Every structure is written in structure tokens, then in C-alpha cells.
């Protein structure tokens, strides 16, 4: 029988792994088979770190050395239903805001989508109230001596809400699915440490079928269920942040039997949207509401809320009125509503505030003169009056920011912060050759047309920079889609822009590496600093306690080099009715509904 191209690839790849073929010979034969150079080069390099699955093959023992137990924190079993004052039939209503675009955990990207999916599914790991990795779908784990092989033991007796047992195969399917180029998930890059993950995810889904299959096979071998309760994941390199990634939605165990064959919108049929989380969906009316009932089989105990309702109201004014009328049990008000809330004794007494895990910055094109001079960027960073911005533009909501990392992040540092300093800003600009702004080219600061808040922000920056530095900045309106296209395509004509980052998981890598590290497309054009890259690359491979000093150095260096001028950290505002109790507070989350929603309960009345 004539062998297929795929079979030939498997054979020559196996020879390469065994050492029976040189890499040069592999590249030559792969090219003869029609495999692209980039993919062939990747497979050549991957041969030393991963095995491609072949039909009937037995798992190959990892060469990474004996594993040790992964330290996992505890989350107490204390469900709200067991509280003596809990209303057993409690109904809790929350506003979701806008209708979600997708409920698919391996695709979604927005907070409202996470809110919905987190009620239905349990991630492989969770985070406790100190933001430390804890057991969830996996009750324990080990990591190899070189930090590249994680082995998870799936919780015994865990089931989906329909009674079907949860297995390692379910988690393997879901995590692998998050790397599929066909699924095209928005957070696939969080899994790029997985051997073969980036190459498969970034492959053309319409490309050569044999090439795609080989790339997929590498990932299949990197993410595999050894048996019903044992999941093994192999990484290209030690990644100290990896346990944190295992606590986010990309690991939610969607079921293959409910997903495959039902199209990209499989989740819209609630019969398919079945998980192992604290609640199960009972109804969904698009643009109106989602209704959940508690999952009596939830592994952490019966949740304290009998019925959970998410309504969909986009107007913050309407939402606040509904809260005042008792239609919502909690809400997150807009910053602009703070004066109204503080003026109302009842609302003021129900308001809670905490630092938010987000940062805003003013970005400068580091390739465009004069912003290719570090002194110019530093001058702009020193010229921003952050306190005034928070007071005047942000209605007093937020914290002036001098670094990327927010207070409360484990690597937050105060060794070097960007601060408002008029004299220093003027001195730096003069050093760069523009004393008093003389000779400095006029710049446009684009903002979203017909958006009053965007215009107000741009006007503030223009006036602030003119007053301190004497430079001319012209606020210029632009259609939102056009402006977004400039940002997305990293158009070199975009000199100024504003940026922000909202935390996905509370590890410094999610900030310093993903946003400003090697290969990023989120940082301004021209920012690719070898010193910075070396710091974060080293830190990413270490356990967090060893990595923190390096991350702190990187955070300080980033602030000092000023590819952007940081100006604001976020702040959480939450209104909570007095009879809603049991919620767990995290460093940057006042009411946790993602990891410990089962503890929330409501008293009668």
C-alpha cells in the first residue's frame, strides 16, 4: 500500500527523535514532502522535547527527572447553603451588562463572558483569596525537576451537573482545543509554553493538511491523559507562571460529545452548555437574561444561592435605579456615578472600594523622532500630572500610576516610579534639544470622535503637556473603527495612543512579559529592549518567590526607560445589599464570583 504524506512525516520525525537522522536530512526530506520551512524548522527543534503520537503507541516516560509535589494552597469547604441564617430559596440578581459574543471558554475574551462561563465550569486549578494556586478540577499535581512536565491528578468523584464523570480526557480535550487554529481562541497565547502550542495555533487552518496534522500531533503528545485521573502537560521551557494559567478559563472542561458537530455556536443550546461548576444554566433569552440553578453535585458543597439571574442592562443609570429599587443585589457603578452615590447615605453605606488590577498608559511611538530619544519619553512621563488626572478626569476613581504593576501585585515595587516633576521634565526635554519646547514638532493626539470621555482625556493630556513642556499637541477626532485599525495594525503613523491592561491572572508574567516582553504586539512600536527582555525571560522560568526580584527590576527598568507614560491604576467600586453575605474578597476583587461563588448566600428579608 502506498503510504500517505502524513505517515511519511511521522516516520521521518520519529527517526529524527531517535537520532537516526540529522536535522539537515530531516529538513531536506520535509521540504521534499511539501512541508514549509518554518514548520519543518519548528519540528526539527521540537524533536528533542516532545514525542509525536503514533497509533497504538504507549506513553513515553519523561526524561525530565523525578517530579516533586506542586505546592497548592487550600480553599476551604464552607458553602453558603450550610450557614445557619441562609435563605434556602435565595434568588440573587446581578447585571451582566451587554449580551455576550461567545460562551465558549476556549474562545472568549471579555469579562461578561468569563462571568457566565465561570458559573458553569471549574478550571484545572483555582486561586485562593491570597491569589495563590489551589486545587480545583485537579486535587494535586507534581512538576518535574526541570520544571517542564506537570502531572495533574483529577479530583476523584467529580461529575458534570448531568452526572457524567469528569476525567483527565475532558481537561486534555479542552486545553488542546484552546490551541487549535480552527477554534482560534483569543487567549491561546497563555498556553504557548506548551510544547508545539504556538506553532500549531499560528498555523494556517486552511494550509497543508499533513503539515497541520503533524503540528497537532506534537500538541496531542504534549497534552495527554495517561488515564482517567491523570493529565500530563509538557512545556518547552520551565514556566513558573504556568500554574496560574491553569486557573483561567482556557482550562474549562467543555465536553467533546457536546461540542463536536454542533458548530462554533454550540454553547447557545443550553443542553450543550453543561459543566462541573457551582451552577447550571436553566434558560437564556438573548439580550435579556441568563438564569442558573445551583448544582447540587458541586464538589465544594451545595451553593448558597438557589437561583442566580444575570440581567442585561447596558445603561449604568438604569442599572443604578434598578439597584435602588431592590432589583439587583449588587452592582459595579461607573466612576461618574460616585458623586451621586456618596451623596446618598444608603448607597454610601453599601459602597465598597478596592484597588483594581488594571493600568492605563500614554504610549509613544519609540521609532518616530523625537520619541526615539529616551530623554523625550522621560520628559513626557515626568510631565503628566497623574493626581490631577484622577481627580478631574476620572472623578476621583483610580490610583495615580507610576509603573505597570499595580499595588498588590506580588512584584509591585517603589524603587523607581514615574512621578510628576515639572522641573525634571523641562530639564530632560532641554537635554534632548528642545528647551521650553522650542523646535519640538507639533503632534496630533487622536481620540474617538463622538466620545466625550475620549475627547476629555485627550484635551487634558494636550493642555497638561503644553503647560509643563511648552509642546503643541492637537487633540484630533477620528472614527473609532479607523483608530482601532491603526492600533491593531501598529501603524507607524500613530505617534500617540492610550493603552491599558486588565489582569488575566495575578502573576507578573501576565503583565511584564505578555504586554512589554519579547515578541509582544501590545507595546509601542520600537520597544524591544534586550536588558528588559533578558530580565523577564529569566524570571518567567522561575518559581514566583525566586522570580519576584527579577520582575521588580524589570518593572523599575520599564518605568525608567519610559516607552510609555503610566498614569492610572484602576479601582473597583461595588454596591452590595446588606443581606448578601459570604462573598470572598481577593486583593483586587471585592466580591469573588469566579472561584468561590458557592460561599455567597442571602439572608431572608
PLM feature spans:
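Extracellular/periplasmic solute-recognition and catalytic clefts
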Residues: 282-293, 303, 309-368, 387, ...
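N-terminal secretory signal peptides
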Residues: 1-25, 32-34, 39, 44, ...
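Gly/Pro-rich hinge or "lid" segments in bacterial periplasmic/extracellular proteins
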Residues: 129-132, 205-210, 216-218, 224, ...
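Long beta-strand-rich cores associated with HINT superfamily self-processing modules
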Residues: 574-605
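N-terminal lobe/hinge region of extracytoplasmic solute-binding protein
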Residues: 95-145, 272-275
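Ligand/substrate-recognition segments at binding pockets and active sites
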Residues: 286, 430-503, 524, 544, ...
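Extracytoplasmic/peripheral linker and loop segments enriched in polar/acidic and small residues
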Residues: 80, 85, 217, 224, ...
